[in-house]
Regions:
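Gram-negative (and chloroplast) outer-membrane scaffold detector with strong preference
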Residues: 55-137, 202-213
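Sec-dependent N-terminal signal peptides
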Residues: 4-14
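Short glycine/proline- and aromatic-enriched beta-strand/turn motifs that initiate or cap beta-hairpins
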Residues: 19-59, 117, 131, 140-142, ...
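Outer-membrane beta-barrel translocator domains and adjoining extracellular loop/strand segments
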Residues: 36-42, 82-91, 134-144, 188-194
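Outer-membrane beta-barrel proteins
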Residues: 40-44, 60, 91-95, 112, ...
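Residues that define the transmembrane beta-barrel architecture of outer-membrane proteins
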Residues: 21, 44-50, 97-103, 156-162, ...
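Predominantly the C-terminal beta-signal and adjacent terminal strand-loop region
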Residues: 75-83, 151-213
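Repeated loop/turn-to-beta-strand initiation elements of outer-membrane beta-barrel proteins
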Residues: 23-25, 62-64, 68, 115, ...
Length: 213
């Protein structure tokens, strides 16, 4: 048993020393997709938005067939929409905004096409998602109603997603990537009726650019 622990510690020290770490930051566009299912009927809606992120790239292996590493990060995601109508001379305004804090932990494979100039990569892994706020706001010239879905309805703020994507690194400094995070958990937290199962699943498509320090 002692020998086993010694091997684990030695392996961890080797990885810590051998791994090449690199900090990166990025911004981009995202499309938040929500699918609501009641019984056998589904309805989907989408919100446009943006994200800001920071990530750390740990290259664990660097071989002729490519590189393999782990890429943990932290990402702020915003998405929303607003609309305005006039009914019987009264202007009504409604808006929905979603704020998320995402923690992706990706396994990343890269292949160098042109030395120090062009690297293509693919990545996949879990994304731990925390809903910070889901604000629904309605107003007229005389009144304003504002609710937070996480506090005022049966909408869960936590989600576990599986993220997949591909990207390109340019000159070891710049990167472009596109991906999708598939939500696994049912975000509806209320009481269920057998004949009318209620489900809410969210997913996020994104495309962005980044800079590696």
């Amino acid at each position: 048993m002692k020998k086993f622990y010694f091997i684990l510690v030695a392996a961890a020290m080797f990885v810590a020393v051998d791994a090449k770490a690199q900090l990166g930051v990025g911004v981009g566009y995202n499309l938040l997709n929500t699918t609501t299912t009641v019984a056998d009927e589904s309805e989907s809606s989408s919100l446009n938005g943006f994200y800001i992120e920071a990530e750390y790239n740990f290259n664990l292996l660097d071989e002729q067939w490519g590189t393999l590493g782990i890429q943990p990060g932290i990402r702020y995601t915003f998405a929303g929409e607003a609309e305005q109508e006039e009914v019987l001379g009264i202007k009504t305004r409604a808006s929905l905004t979603e704020h998320y804090l995402d923690i992706p932990v990706q396994v990343k494979y890269g292949y160098e096409v042109i030395s120090s100039k062009l690297n293509i990569n693919a990545f996949a892994g879990p994304v731990f998602s925390i809903g910070l706020a889901s604000i629904v706001k309605g107003s007229t010239d005389d009144s304003v109603v504002k609710t937070n879905a996480y506090k005022d309805s049966d909408y869960g703020r936590f989600d576990l997603k599986i993220g997949v994507g591909v990207g390109v690194d340019l000159f070891e400094k710049f990167n472009v990537k596109v991906g999708y995070n598939f939500g696994l958990l049912n975000r509806y937290t209320g009481e269920q009726i057998d004949e009318y199962k209620y489900k809410i699943h969210t997913g996020v498509f994104y495309v962005g650019v980044g800079y590696n320090f």
